[in-house]
UniProtKB/Swiss-Prot annotation:
This is Ribonucleoside-diphosphate reductase subunit alpha. The keyword Oxidoreductase applies. It comes from the Bacteria. Belongs to the ribonucleoside diphosphate reductase large chain family. Provides the precursors necessary for DNA synthesis. Catalyzes the biosynthesis of deoxyribonucleotides from the corresponding ribonucleotides. The record marks 251, 281 as: Allosteric effector binding. Keywords: Allosteric enzyme, ATP-binding, Deoxyribonucleotide synthesis, Disulfide bond, Nucleotide-binding, Oxidoreductase. The record marks 244, 478 as: Important for hydrogen atom transfer.
Amino acid sequence: MHPTLISAPISSSANDAHAGTSQGSHQGHRIQVIRRDGSSTPLNIGKIRAVVDWACLGLEVNSIALEAGLTTRLREGISTREIQDNLISCALEMCSPNEPDWRYVAGRLHVWSLWKDTLVRRGYQYGQYLRTVQTKVTNGEYDSRILTYSEGELQEAGCWINSDWDTDYDYAGAVLLTSRYLLPNELPQEALLTCALLLASVEAPDRRLQWARRFYESIAARRISLATPILANLRVPGGSLTSCFIVAMEDNLESIFGEITNAARISKNGGGVGVNVSRIRATGSWVMGKPNASGGVIPWTKLLNDTAIAVNQGGRRAGAVTVGLDVWHLDVPEFLEMQAENGDQRRKAYDIFPQLILPDEFMRRVINKEDWTLVDPYEVREKMGIELAELWGEQFEGAYREIESNLDTTITLYKRINARELFKQIMRTQVETGMPYLSFKDTINKANPNKHLGYIPGTNLCCESFSNVTPGQDAHCCNLVSLNLANLDLQDIAGVSQIAVRMLDNTIELTAPPFADAKSHNNKYRTIGVGAMGLADWLAKRRLNYDELADINRLFEEIGYWCTQSSMELAKERGAYPAFPGSDWQKGLLIGSKPVSWFQANAAKPERWEKLSNDIQTHGIRNSHITAIAPNTSSSLVQGCTASILPVYSRFFYDKWAKGTVPIAPPFIGNCFWFYPENKTMDQRKVVKAVAAIQQWTDTGISMELLFNLNAGIYFPEEPERSLNAKDIFDTLVMAWEAGCKAIYYIRTVQKDDFKDSSDGCVACAN
């Protein structure tokens, strides 16, 4: 990364570095500058030059150019804040693919402004951490659990703070960190240190400072990225630290409204939630014995939609809900039209994220162009005693064929449709809206280590986290962090994985679950999700291509092994998760419920996997699910790396923010420009192959977006007039299922005649 700075030119008083009493001139006369405290003083060009030199130190930029750009914007009565903003604007305007380091200059200047504002408001910057903690606990801003540490321990911890870490952010990262995550009068390293101390507060008193320092250094050096709920909520009283939830509705009012209430509680705390509605009776079904009385799943989905809008994550943004429906449900055709502009607006839900759950039997019929039967779960349940939503694999296939053999005799409410035609309708909706998400139910459940206690109905909001869900008993919940691969080498994986797993296991003790079913799941399964971001950076730094599957396999084997091994070591220390007896883990199966023989045949280091299997059978494992790769669209900007495990959309582009146009580029663009393949021109089959390779070493899921460029000549250079067609997209989606991917998140498209150069805004993957 970029070199850190030994010290910044910060004055000990609240005066600004842009102003002072020394002689300074501009255009032949002395300009008066308004300081942050409201006083006036002559402009001091020397101090401006010192700040500019500091912001440019060690970067491949010309500081004189920045100073020259500023001088044209100086005027009588200008404030030091305006000078600072003008410096930032100049730096951003000079940023380009040839000079990408200007975004780091702008980031440092933004942090400088934060330091100065904090000095003015509270009278000190870094150096008085104990005072900060005491003040914020008194004001109700910090959780009082931080005071389980003694004053001496807090003073010692304050000495770990390294303000140079603040200067490693580019402008996008600095702005996001300060605007989204910091409390009033709080500096970045204070926030990160407080998180680390709280994460370690559940450790043994004689070891917690040791762990707190390891946590802090991993977070502050951006080797581990905390998920938004942890970074935003851990410091505040009563915060939920959980990112992902899944609930399921029974076919009765008590369950339906109970889960809507639970979704509201989740949204209030900033989490995203998946809601499975497959048990709910279809449109035209019976209600209290009356035929053709049910309105189906759409009215309940609309209620969830409106709940997400009303309970807006503490005023930060609208809630986020994905509604999952099994593809055999009679309401699937209307579900696919639920976000179309035409039709009855009372049966529309534009703000939720639809998800379809697909069994293998459906996919086989799609490939073979066979018929598919849509049925009413209520009629099937009442007349045949089958709860179809709970079945998967061979059990589902047998029950489904039995249902089909009883059409017209027993089952009267149904619809026959060609499976291929239904899949085409799904694809059309995806191209138009990006959704529905697709969850491959059998693939997900075959890899479920807790089959002995239930099944997985679908995925969470981002399609990477899922485990058993039982309506009214257990609601899936998972706490997340991600490894920042841009800042890691292979030899770092073991140590950082141990820290990440331990951190997340501690969050289970610290979080405040928003409802009883979530607490029950937390206690029973202890599900966590260690993810990854910056794969594109890791590959580019090593001059590797995105289709270098052997290297990708080696990297994620290390992550999978060390995260699993770390959870086993925690079980030695703290005990196995309560649902471990009878699980696939106890039977000696490993990641994805695969036997040791698979690892002996496919792993780079097969012998360690056999030992790990034996150790887990002997000692247990602390967490039922351990790894899950989230999309990380925003948090990757704070981390200064590319999002998740996907290629970059574009090597360099400008994003439109409230603060103006912001340049976005990967960290190693200066030296590795051509080793960042652009997703907007990449054959998406390469993405599927890479995700499938990573999935082998990931026990939960991966947020896999697919981006299809519909312009001519992109994928077929030998046929410049040819553009992607429906069959190409169809083949890619089927390939994802066949390759063992568990879900497909968004389908993005670059529309015809809307193709942008790298320097233009990102039009296809804005989040």
